[in-house]
């Protein structure tokens, strides 16, 4: 078992990483929550696989448990889904002394966290991430949000969980497409902060070799994010480097209506494209983009896309949350493991 402590001024919490942790979720929940009711927010796929077993595991610790399930996919992370969830919480008579659990990938984590931050002006919640992307990235750091038609994560807040429980074995039920999706974020961490992690990923013979070491990979990624979040909780400085590849990635997701490319796939394309642009402008060491593209391809990730409507891309980029005071903060690399913030304008991409 590995435990990381996220130390923040107003709230600190543990990230627990252990194989077969799902058999002990109830016990761990009891260490941070002494209320009565627990509402689990999940999606239909995960509910079919884990819902009943995890519900019983938590009930065995004396809690009253209700499971609320939504349709899988990014389109559930929207305002139209919220009233149904809020009403089910009201029917369950959930109070501010109770608990919400986010059981799922990045979409469920963002959605359930947003619900927890807004229902009754705030209810405690726990993250139980089940996808690789959520385990290495979105479950840690307190960002919760829903999407608007005009862009991703445009309405949200910073709302940290009481606890993050990560069972790497739960990745065994993940479709290969979504394992690859998470690898996009894993590679991102190597790019921005850890040359050692990047070289470790280069050194694995294949994806199966990586999977055998997945617990350690998850720990390394969470530790990098922990350090960055502790230094810049509200995303006004260093934390922006976690968005390497995301400016173009979010634009790609939006242009393709969140259907063609998953988040990690879009970020992978964004990392490759931005690195090539930066090399052309002598802002990144020559050869860096080639290494990134090679590693992305090694793990089955797309590296390029044809954006026919540049106007759509431009508008999506303008809505990027790293834009401050009319300027666009783009995340670039000096070299592998050395991310930095580059202040520019949207014309950078033209």
UniProtKB/Swiss-Prot annotation:
CDD domains tied to this protein: DHQS
Cofactor-binding details, from the entry: Binds 1 divalent metal cation per subunit. Can use either Co(2+) or Zn(2+).
Family matches, as InterPro entries: Dehydroquinate_synthase (IPR050071), DHQ_synth_AroB (IPR016037), DHQ_synth_fam (IPR030963), DHQS/DOIS_N (IPR030960), DHQS_C (IPR056179)
Record bears the keyword Transferase: no
Binding of Zn(2+), residues: 185, 246, 263
Annotated metabolic or biological route of this protein: Metabolic intermediate biosynthesis; chorismate biosynthesis; chorismate from D-erythrose 4-phosphate and phosphoenolpyruvate: step 2/7
GO biological process, one term: aromatic amino acid family biosynthetic process
Annotated GO MF terms: 3-dehydroquinate synthase activity; metal ion binding; nucleotide binding
Gene3D superfamilies in UniProt: 3.40.50.1970, Dehydroquinate synthase-like - alpha domain
Binding site for NAD(+): 106-110, 130-131, 143, 152
Keyword Cytoplasm tagged: yes
HAMAP family (UniProt xref): DHQ_synthase
Protein family per UniProt: Belongs to the sugar phosphate cyclases superfamily. Dehydroquinate synthase family.
UniProt protein name: 3-dehydroquinate synthase
Source species: Clostridium perfringens (strain ATCC 13124 / DSM 756 / JCM 1290 / NCIMB 6125 / NCTC 8237 / Type A)
Lineage, broadest ranks: Bacteria, Bacillati, Bacillota, Clostridia, Eubacteriales
Gene from which the chain derives: aroB
């Amino acid at each position: 078992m590995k435990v990381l402590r996220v130390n923040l001024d107003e709230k600190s919490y543990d990230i627990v990483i252990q194989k077969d942790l799902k058999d002990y979720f109830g016990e761990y929940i009891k260490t941070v929550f002494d209320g009565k009711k627990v509402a689990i927010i999940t999606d239909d796929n995960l509910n079919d696989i884990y819902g009943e077993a995890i519900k019983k595991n938590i009930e065995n610790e004396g809690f009253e448990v209700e499971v609320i399930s939504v349709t899988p996919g990014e389109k559930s992370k929207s305002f139209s889904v919220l009233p149904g969830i809020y009403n089910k919480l009201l029917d369950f008579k959930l109070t501010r002394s109770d608990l919400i659990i986010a059981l799922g990938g990045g979409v469920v984590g963002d959605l359930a966290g947003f619900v927890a931050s807004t229902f009754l002006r705030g209810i405690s919640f726990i993250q139980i991430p089940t996808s690789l992307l959520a385990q290495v990235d979105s479950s840690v750091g307190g960002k919760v949000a829903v999407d608007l038609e005009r862009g991703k994560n445009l309405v949200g807040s910073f709302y940290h969980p009481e606890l993050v429980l990560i069972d790497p074995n739960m990745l065994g039920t993940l479709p290969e497409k979504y394992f690859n999706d998470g690898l996009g974020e894993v590679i991102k961490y190597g790019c921005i902060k850890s040359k050692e992690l990047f070289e470790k990923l280069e050194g694995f013979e294949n994806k199966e070799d990586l999977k055998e070491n997945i617990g350690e990979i998850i720990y390394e990624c969470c530790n990098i994010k922990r350090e960055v979040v502790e230094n810049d909780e509200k995303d006004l400085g260093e934390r922006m480097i976690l968005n390497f590849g995301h400016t173009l990635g979010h634009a790609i997701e939006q242009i393709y209506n969140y259907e063609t490319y998953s988040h990690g796939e879009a970020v992978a394309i964004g990392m490759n494209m931005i690195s090539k642009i930066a090399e052309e402008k002598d802002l990144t060491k020559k050869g860096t983009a080639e290494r990134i593209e090679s590693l992305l391809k090694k793990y089955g990730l797309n590296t390029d896309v044809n954006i026919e409507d540049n106007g759509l891309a431009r508008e999506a980029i303008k809505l990027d949350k790293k834009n401050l005071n009319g300027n666009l903060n783009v995340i670039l690399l000096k070299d592998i493991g050395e991310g930095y913030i580059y202040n520019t304008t949207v014309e950078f991409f033209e």
